[in-house]
């Protein structure tokens, strides 16, 4: 059976049958099907033509329906949503339905249309004029009387939900005005009709690198996320994606989502089209409607931000649309935990997400402090073992196996963990990765200001724009603005490396080069990232410098563990010194030794 084309007038198409109208070809397709409708094709053609919208007769009319969070405008052509705008708490108005000035009402696929797929009606009702049946502050109702041979009355009711300002309740009623019963849907696999949303979700975040739109649906307590970039029309059925037996389906961008939920059993959904312009529809299963009876099916439509509290209040399970990581569930849970803490700081301490980020950084640094202290001690112990390690290298030469064995014995004897200094950095990597996603895609940070020039924590902190663009690797789109936070972050990292203990009295040239280039490389990588992430890294680096300054690590010689070697000599312990001061003292001692060696050398030559 061939799905109907969207054309319902006498327009001809450029194909081998171009001499015949689209409706005539649709009629032939239905005659050849196994279960055609029991109506006369000629009468159906006349009835559809009578429904067609003619702008010359009267222009389309628009009707508004508003809530505290939504501004909706409906057109009487198709009884569809012409404009849908979400009102954000900061006063911003974000349209989710694009405007198309100059385009006739019946030529654009506006959302919330009806489709009778393998019926003579097809989507003809979307190009037909409906009558305004009733209107109040929060409810609007459209109706259409179908002439012979269809004999039906269809009513579409739109109402703002009383318990949620971002939820639109939709009811579609089909009244059979025939003298006998009728079946909507040609066979068991055929839907009665479908309520559609198209085209896509236009939420103004298309420039966001992580704003790839997704189809999300819930099937038997399992959520599926499907990137719309993978949509591909299947030649066997014309669909791009079929989603059987689901509870709800959603189209999600980075910050906004449109979700449709069926309030009846046996719902399914499908998607048609290409990634740039696709249509998603919720299907009503095949039903028999007795003479004079009415079939009513209810839907809920959520139009709003991808924000946990708003999604959770809409209906159970919709909050699962919020997902930062689709492949690693533990990272998604961790990222949501970070967002929860940030929201708590915002709601409980100060209503500024910039300060919430600073508080989170302090919390993470405090939690990591014991490991940081242990890591610093481990690095200092490694520093003091450097002479003995050099001695082992000289003794074993090129025998790597023997050298590794001797090194491990030395570590064990002196109680040193060679990886201890790396643990704090490794443990912070999940935090960094999680916050990278949170700051770039969480709705809470969209347009959230901090101080001064930082007006959007989800975007780079452009102090001013450059009159040119510099193509720099690892910066995505190059450098076209002066972003201050990553520069300050790089300077703070340079200062931090100056305070880090080295692995020996004289730093390895490769290590020195790495320590010099790392701040520069990191600043370049983070240059065009969200300012919220750069604020976190800058604050963490500064706190690390403060920690290093006040942490005093004992400068005593490392003694073997009791029972492994001689016991430490008794006596007064040397006064603990900051490891940076101790390193500087050692450098001064080495310089003095070099000067003494030079003097001895000159004295020896004089005697000769």
Regions found by a protein language model. Name each.
Residues 358, 426, 430-433, 521, ...:
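Residue-level signal for the membrane-embedded core of alpha-helical transmembrane segments
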Residues 349-356, 360, 480-485, 511-514:
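Membrane-interface starts of transmembrane alpha-helices
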